[in-house]
From Swiss-Prot:
Keyword Repeat attached: no
Subcellular location: Cell membrane
The entry's keywords: Cell membrane, Membrane, Transmembrane, Transmembrane helix
Membrane spanning stretches: 4-24, 32-52, 55-75, 104-124, 143-163, 177-197
Record carries keyword Ubl conjugation: no
Signal peptide feature range: none
Protein name, per record: Uncharacterized protein MJ0611.1
Membrane topology: Multi-pass membrane protein
GO CC annotation: plasma membrane
């Protein structure tokens, strides 16, 4: 593929295209999508920091569930995203219990929001496999807008929702309906939640 640069002018588009150009030459599309899927947790963590005005202590709410999830995936001999729906239940229950304990001793709105979202995902996962990637990123897109009023940051997250959703379908990790359901629920659950709090 030949690079298309806008003359000698290095616009943001040219930087993005140049990075894409290099990635395509080094990696396959599948590998790029796998990297994007792995970056999901980083995007969620950055989102958490944005909505909490960079409250680093919230790392506690995020760190231990992630470690448990990865360890559980190893125990079950699965990839880190645990594609088997039933194997997702134990780490989700652990996260729910852990966040409940944190919420009792540390009454923080973001812990409560995280807790409710994990509960919703757990209930759905008991019966059906939903895209947690798209649920988490779309929830974060809405929460960033609700707490920061930043349309451009929310737009970045919505773009990530689209790219990640496509990647999950391309990698055959989810069906289209699972990705769409995750996206719609991520936004709607948090919209309802913030209107109730």
């Amino acid at each position: 593929m030949e690079s298309i640069y806008l003359g000698n002018c290095w616009t943001p588009f040219n930087w993005i295209y140049a990075i894409y150009d290099v990635l395509v030459k080094i990696l396959s599309i599948r590998e790029i999508f796998q990297i994007l899927s792995l970056m999901y947790l980083l995007f969620l963590y950055i989102g958490f920091l944005l909505i909490s005005k960079f409250d680093i202590s919230l790392s506690l709410a995020f760190f231990f569930p992630c470690v448990f999830w990865i360890c559980w995936a190893k125990i079950k001999n699965e990839t880190w995203d645990i594609p088997n729906r039933k194997n997702r239940l134990v780490p989700l229950i652990f996260t729910l219990i852990y966040l409940s304990i944190l919420a009792i001793f540390w009454k923080n709105i973001f812990i409560i929001i995280f807790l409710v979202n994990v509960l919703v995902i757990l209930i759905i996962t008991k019966f059906w496999k939903i895209s947690m990637h798209n649920y988490g990123l779309s929830a974060m897109a809405y929460l960033i807008y609700a707490f920061t009023n930043s349309i451009w940051l929310s737009t970045i997250y919505l773009i990530l929702v689209i790219i990640t959703g496509y990647a999950r379908i391309y990698l055959k990790k989810h069906t289209v309906s699972q990705v769409i359901a995750g996206t719609i629920l991520g936004i709607s659950v948090n919209y309802i939640l913030l209107n109730l709090i």
